Amino acid sequence: MKSRIALSVLFVLIAAATFAQSDAQKSSAAPAPSEAQKSFTTMKSLAGEWEGPVTVADAPEMSGAKMHLSLRVTSRGNALVHEFQEAGTPLDATKYDHPVTMLYVDGDQLTLIHYCDAGNRPRMTGKMSPDGKTVEFEFKDISGSPEYHMHHAVFTLIDANHHTEDWTFMMKDKPMHAHFDLQRKN
């Protein structure tokens, strides 16, 4: 009889511990990702090497140049490095324009900082479109001279191997738009 009672108590204790552990796991489950985190996850899906032409309506002599883009996830998945260069040019910052852009989540905002060859660092915040295919960045502020700076960016995902980027550069008060049509290289 005592062994049956002890066995019954043991089963009750095991069941109670199992349910308590199950409830603890439910309450410690990760919260749903924020809109900024969802947008960042979308941006990280672009990691890799890309190439394609640029179109600049305001400067036809620049149109048609083949560009190379490297997108790399770094810092344990917390940052995305975006680096443009003209295809076929060496990585020599003293001779060629190789702007670097960093993307990351800051609180509840997807943030982009563009380290420009103009010597400034515009900061933009991004939002994903309802269909999840476009992330648009709006100018927030700038470190350095605001006279010439990147002011706006739009990333549009066509499919896993094709995306476009539209960047707006401010030349004093005049916007200059550049459209990049990029195909995955790897």
Question: Where would I find each of the regions flagged by the language model?
Answer:
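Bacterial N-terminal signal peptides that target proteins for export
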Residues: 1-9
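Bacterial N-terminal signal peptides
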Residues: 8-17
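Hydrophobic small-molecule pocket/channel-lining residues, especially in calycin-type beta-barrels
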Residues: 21-186
